Each structure stands twice: as structure tokens, then as C-alpha cells.
Amino acid sequence: MVRPTEAEVKKSLSRLPAARKRAGNRAHLATYRRLLKYSTLPDLWRFLSSRPQNPPLGHHRLFFEVTLGHRIADCVILVSGGHQPVCYVVELKTCLSHQLIPTNTVRTSQRAQGLCQLSDSIHYIAHSAPPGTEAWTITPLLIFKNQKTLKTVYSESPGAFPTPVHTTEGKLCAFLTARENADIRKVLSKVPKKPKMDRGGKILGPTPGKRAVYSQAHHGRNKKGRPWTAQPTRAKSRTKDKGTPAFPRAGPACSGP
């Protein structure tokens, strides 16, 4: 795949319609939410990689939209507890196609841009991470996702060898947390509540007690808001003379128009 120049990349990507860019942003957020759903590293790796034969071992932590110098890494994954702790820097690109076509100008421009972003991000971490006694490696990942299905259509780990850095897990976590986009993390933390369902899959309403309270309150508001509701001002029965029963009314009183 021929790598275009930086000027060609900017020119090609600037021609994308605004609607395509908005769709790409939505796909990024949807991908972040999917990543947060996976509790195990093998499941997360199957979602990310197009060739998930050898997933890393250990436990992981996720960071999104991390500012690293003049670049913003889409996602950083720290994997520790295994044989070798690894810091994965992930650059996401989205597309409408189900495969990466080498001759497509937009795809080649996206790839070239992603490789430059990864190179700068890794260089920043290697030279700016707080020093420590643990030997970590920084590994870049370039991933293309389909905007609609979020399936990985292409993945690449550029570079012949991972970049080493000596730090500690605690220091690296603090380093990335301080540079993570707090607004994105807040949006991702807001998970919509699912409605309660019964065994047949139907949405359950409020409990009988709550329905009764709501019904009484609602009925009281309606009565106050109706000026035509008849208000009793006299006794139910009245006699002209003692011992003489009142005559029955010709019909029921009107309770309203």
C-alpha cells in the first residue's frame, strides 16, 4: 500500500462531507461503549482485532481520547499481570466498506494519518511517562471499523519492534488519567436504564401501590382544575315541616356540561 504525503492526506480528508465526519464520530463513541462492555481481555481482543489468534494475557484498563503532546490517542489499553506488561495505543478509523481497498484514496489517506498519529503518540509516552522500575512495552494498533456494524475490517500493528519504557503501573495510570478527556468519560459513564421486563418480554409498569398513589394525586389535581364540578352547598334532604319527607328530585344533578 503506497503511503501518500502529508499534503495529499490533508487534501483528501478535507473533502469528506460533514455528514460522513459526524457518522465517524458516532462510530467512535459506539466503539468506546462496546469496549467498556467487555470484562475479559480475550473478548475485548476479539472485538478489536481482525486476527485474534493470540490475545494478550492479564487484566486491562481503558483510557479514551488521551492527549499525548499534539496528538490525541483514541484509546490506550494497559495490560498488566501477564508475562510482559504492555501499553497499547489504539488509533481508530471508520469506513462504510467491509474491506480495506488499497487503491481507495480516502482509505490510504486514513491509514497514513493513523500511522503518523501512532508514531507521535508512542514517542511522547516513551519520553514523558514518569520513570519507574517496571519494564513496559508500547505497542501501536491501527484499526479500521465499519461504521454500521463496528466489525473490524483491517488491523495493523506498525513498527518492527515495540518501544520499551521503564515506569510503573500506578504511575502510568495516573499519567494517562490526567490526560484523558473527562467529558468523553462522563458521556460513556451514562448508561441508559433498561425498562423492567416480565418473563414474556413485556415491559412492566409501576407497582399497584405506586399506581394507587399516582391515581389519587392525579384525581385530586383534576377536581381542582375543573370549575364546573358541582360542590355540595346544601344538605342531602330538607323538610318543610317536621315529619314531612322531602320530595324526591326530578332527576340527578348535573355534574358538568
UniProtKB/Swiss-Prot annotation:
Keywords: Host cytoplasm, Host G2/M cell cycle arrest by virus, Host Golgi apparatus, Host nucleus, Host-virus interaction, Modulation of host cell cycle by virus, Virion. Pfam families: Herpes_UL24 (PF01646). It is found in: Virion; Host cytoplasm; Host nucleus, Host nucleolus; Host Golgi apparatus. Induction: Expressed late in the infection cycle. Disulfide bonds: none annotated. Residues 193-257 are annotated as: Disordered. GO terms for cellular component: host cell Golgi apparatus; host cell nucleolus; virion component. One of its GO terms (biological process) is symbiont-mediated arrest of host cell cycle during G2/M transition. It comes from the Viruses. May participate in nuclear egress of viral particles. Plays a role in the dispersal of several host nucleolar proteins including NCL/nucleolin and NPM1. Since deletion of host NCL/nucleolin negatively impact on nuclear egress, UL24 supposedly acts on this process through its effect on host nucleoli. Induces cell cycle arrest in host cells at the G2/M phase following by apoptosis. The mechanism involves the inhibition of host mitotic complex cyclin-B/CDK1. Belongs to the herpesviridae UL24 family. This is Protein UL24 homolog.
